[in-house]
Amino acid sequence: MALVSMRQLLDHAADDSYGLPAFNVNNMEQVKAIMDAARATSSPVILQGSAGARKYAGEPFLRHLIAAAVEAYPEIPVVMHQDHGASPAVCMGAIKSGFSSVMMDGSLKEDGKTPADYDYNVSVTAKVVELAHAVGVSVEGELGCLGSLETGKGEAEDGHGAEEALDHSKLLTDPDEAAQFVKATQCDALAIAIGTSHGAYKFTRKPTGDILAIDRIKAIHQRIPTTHLVMHGSSSVPQELLEEIRTYGGDIKETYGVPVEEIQEGIRYGVRKVNIDTDIRLAMTAAIRRVGAKNKSEFDPRKFMAAAMEEAKKVCIARFEAFGSAGKAEKIRAIELDEMAKRYASGELAQVVH
């Protein structure tokens, strides 16, 4: 199956009331673990590359790894998504490289650190939407900044994220402003701020409504029912993985992620894309530490990475099943990007705003 537009997958998810984990990838082992999990569960896949991943692996390597996944797993619909594009130029570069979906994160200025104003965000996002939709590529925007409601601070990850203290007007997306934003930009998906943040250190305690505003999702979805909501920074940070890392010599302080049941609640209210990176990192790190501790003479990196892939695969299977995407791959027939471009041009995919 060819690469597909993220809009196609998220439309299907909305019609069938499920969510899709979007996994960040940096190397072959992560791609293979995710795709093996997708095959085991018959789930469609969103593979995404962050700015850090593009810097680490290089965009050509990421692009060809994902192309290999499409070839090796022909029964699985795959989206190749560029995560957190810092400018229209970055997004256009990704489109030219063959990405089928891009994110224009205009919540921050081009440096990826300074919070931007609303008008700037609308301007750059609308520009990317116009150019991307002309070739059938979907666009994710962002309104509000990722950050902790506990500390009032953003969380930089992979070279992207607000570095200054933020007030609640930035840390929580306003439903009325979300409606205005979607009407002005016509983005396909919208990343919203509800108290999540990148990285492993999201919450100092199991999150409740005062630090994780799941109820905000419902209010936003009521205003923009056809725009697919996105939860960034939504790894669950499994406590058993933290404990295993500590058991085999790691030093990770107490921390909590976004509980799976809270994500499931978000899916009921319109979340369709759930970004996950840290959980895979933790799974692979735990496996590598375990192999090294139990086999001190081992020096074949394949032994370490095979165990890491298997541990990551378990996490991915669990998320596909928990979010409801298992069993959906065979129900999807790929729509070519040229056809998506025609649908955008006809107005068929215009967003509904209340």
Swiss-Prot record:
It catalyses: beta-D-fructose 1,6-bisphosphate = D-glyceraldehyde 3-phosphate + dihydroxyacetone phosphate. Binds 2 Zn(2+) ions per subunit. One is catalytic and the other provides a structural contribution. GO terms for biological process: glycolytic process; reductive pentose-phosphate cycle. Zn(2+) 1 binds at H84, H198, H232. Its EC number is 4.1.2.13. Activity is stimulated by Fe(2+) in autotrophically grown cells. InterPro entries: Aldolase_TIM, Class_II_FBP_aldolase, FBA_II, Fruct_bisP_Calv. GO terms for molecular function: fructose-bisphosphate aldolase activity; zinc ion binding. Dihydroxyacetone phosphate binds at G199, G233, S234, S235, N275, I276, D277, T278. Zn(2+) 2 binds at D105, E142. Keywords: Calvin cycle, Glycolysis, Lyase, Metal-binding, Zinc. Catalyzes the aldol condensation of dihydroxyacetone phosphate (DHAP or glycerone-phosphate) with glyceraldehyde 3-phosphate (G3P) to form fructose 1,6-bisphosphate (FBP) in gluconeogenesis and the reverse reaction in glycolysis. Homodimer. NCBIfam families: cbbA, FruBisAldo_II_B. This is Fructose-bisphosphate aldolase. It comes from Xanthobacter flavus.
